[in-house]
Amino acid sequence: MLVLMLVVATTFRLCPLVKARPLCRIRTLRTGKVFPVEEKIQGDRLYFSSGKTHLIKHPCKKNLALYLGRQIFLTKDTFESSLIPFSIPTSMQVGTPEVTSAHFAGSVLLLVVNQKVYVYDYEANFWTASTGIQHPVSHVSGDNCCYSGNSFCMDISNSVFAYLRGDQVSQANIYFSNSRGYRFQKYTQERRAELVGTFGGIFSFHSLSQVGLLLVDEQMAMFSYSDHPLNRSFGLPFDYDRALDILIAPGQKGILIFWSEKNLLVSRNSGQLVESVQVREGQRILYNSIVKANVTIHSVAANENELAVLTEENNLYYGSLGIQSSSLIKFADQNIWSQEAVLMFTDVGMLEILTPLRDVLFPAFDFQKCRLNIQALLMDPQLQAGVCKVELLQGEFENKMYTIDMNSQLELTALMIPRPGMLPVPLVSVSNPHSLGLQAVICEDGYTYDGNTKHRLNISLKQQHHWGRADPNFTSSIKRPTISTITLDIANKEISCVDLKPLTALISVGCDLEKKIVIQNELSACYHGVLDPVALQDNYSYIIEREAYDPNFQGQQAKKDLEVHYPYEKLGCPLLAYYDIPWKPVVELWREGKFQEVVEAEYVLLEMNGLFTYTYSLTASTAGCSAQPQNWTTITKMAGDTAPFSWDRENYISCHDPNYHEPLRWPDVPYQILGGQTENKVVFDQRNGIYIFFISIVDPSYSYCRLETTFSVYVYGAFPLSIFPPEITIVLLTAATLLSIWLAYMIPQLLHTEQGLEGNGFWVRLYQRCRKSCACLWGRC
């Protein structure tokens, strides 16, 4: 019996030892060390002011990262080699080399050192101080977009805020840069003077197309937003009993992570709703908040879909940043924490605990890495992670960027294959529902070789405004370009679905750069033989009379004639228009070389050489204007001489807009807008010649693009203007006709009188003398 008890006791003592297998494999990175050297670090060695360690990874350049602790390290190979502590040149004269904040902005690293911002170009190894900041700052914030080659994406990476945390929000000095931090300018926001509380930070929430100000008041915090419709209210308040570090998860999904030593919060909608992170064991909730776990958080790491937490109690927590909620599970306790340790995701489901190691013989630090395979760890039955219900989730739109212009629609498809017997529910969401609306339909789409059912998901996207299902107070302004991220995930997805990433795509609701307008030119002047295309290509030029043009576009006569070289390579052969028939061009919309539609939106024309020998068929009154319409004269005066062709969708206001209250003082002025709801046309003066027109689509509801082009028209059929006024010509012709009639009547009457006979004889004798004289001249007399 005693032997049996000893065996049982031994078994119970051995079980924990067997189950406590190491969480990770430890390896030490040591490179470039052969012979001992004296420590030589150029410049002032930087250090991080916080007692905690941080690691900032570049979201686009995965091998680039910055370690912030008692030493600072910048790596270009994810710490796969020994590194010398990061330093700043003494020539920068930073004083105390204390770093309070850092941010990767595209191809540069921004550091706040001793309350000033410095820019380090890590590719060129060049330091410079930012300009434009006149007050002390403590933090910089920004985001990065990884879709290279897109101008809209580049704007995201270039945008940076600099600020001092802790001032009253109404008096805080905030600076903004759109040049990756090289140049800053003072940032102003409407109604900021009305806000109450301490300033906790400012962030560009690109996935929501908003700028958010964090307000802290009496241990509670909330976000204030910059633009309609969120600028009329605040985000829901959340606990803020101590300063929280804010981490913006990569991917533009609006995920924010707030953490301190004792708290961890997550927002999936750019701060509108901030929630505590639950701690689970299987399907059971252990704690509704990590605060109740009574741990001290040391390091937090996140990628697009995952979250990891390391505590000073040697606890490692892992969770997914799901579409519905976020929760953590705790792995087995092991000796993995140290004061210098920090967490770092290297790939999906791959986590490393990084610790720098000082070398007494070399200035360069080595790095110890403890690598964890999350998927392998979750297979431990004690974790009760469950089985992933989905075998496959894929879509052609994953990690791509699309553009939706006004009146456009985008169709996306995805494929889901569940495990046999499982019925998972796919969820589609957008980060900015105020701008982008969606409609999703799921249907069966055949079977796999194993007999599993394939499900096809069809997603339709277009502006929320055009769906017609949302209240106008909910939708963002249709005139403002916005951005949104679409995410396809599985509802209540098990934490074991590590490799089953949500499918995301970035949607720019703005200008489609593939669009352009073309003027229809089926019946050109060359086609009808009016102009010779060979002559037009042979350095052709023409003269514009000084009475017909104004170089200042004000309708005043010029002082001299103008010779114009015709750019045939750009314009081709001109359109043909008869001067006496009201005319307007046929404008076509093309995209990627394909015809889309005939443009019916409002547009304006302006002759590029200043010709003013044309007008319009409608006036402000006959066009039905309720307000004084804009015209080229007023637009040009507002723009100045530097931008004569500046009438576009940004500054156009329709005279039919009920919100436009400019009084209609001059109802008889020409109405200079073509297209739209009117039948307005161009009326040419009695003048033949070439007109080169600039055309601009000004309708703000047609496209976010500045759709502009130039084209030429040849006006024909006009007779030359008479020297005398037509009234005088008519009077003279009438008088000559009446005189001819009177002479035709009077001459026969006079020939039968005595005076008439004498006159007739006079003319006969005169004729005979002239005849005789002419004969003598020819030598016949």
UniProtKB/Swiss-Prot annotation:
Parts of the chain on the Cytoplasmic side: 750-781
Disulfide bridge partners, by residue number: 24-370, 60-146, 145-153, 388-497, 511-705, 526-573, 625-655
Database matches in InterPro entries: CATSPERD/E, CATSPERD/E_C, CATSPERD_b-prop, Ig-like_CATSPERD
Keyword Cell cycle: no
Subcellular location(s) of the protein: Cell projection, Cilium, Flagellum membrane
Binding partners and assembly: Component of the CatSper complex or CatSpermasome composed of the core pore-forming members CATSPER1, CATSPER2, CATSPER3 and CATSPER4 as well as auxiliary members CATSPERB, CATSPERG, CATSPERD, CATSPERE, CATSPERZ, C2CD6/CATSPERT, TMEM249, TMEM262 and EFCAB9. HSPA1 may be an additional auxiliary complex member. The core complex members CATSPER1, CATSPER2, CATSPER3 and CATSPER4 form a heterotetrameric channel.
Official protein name in the record: Cation channel sperm-associated auxiliary subunit delta
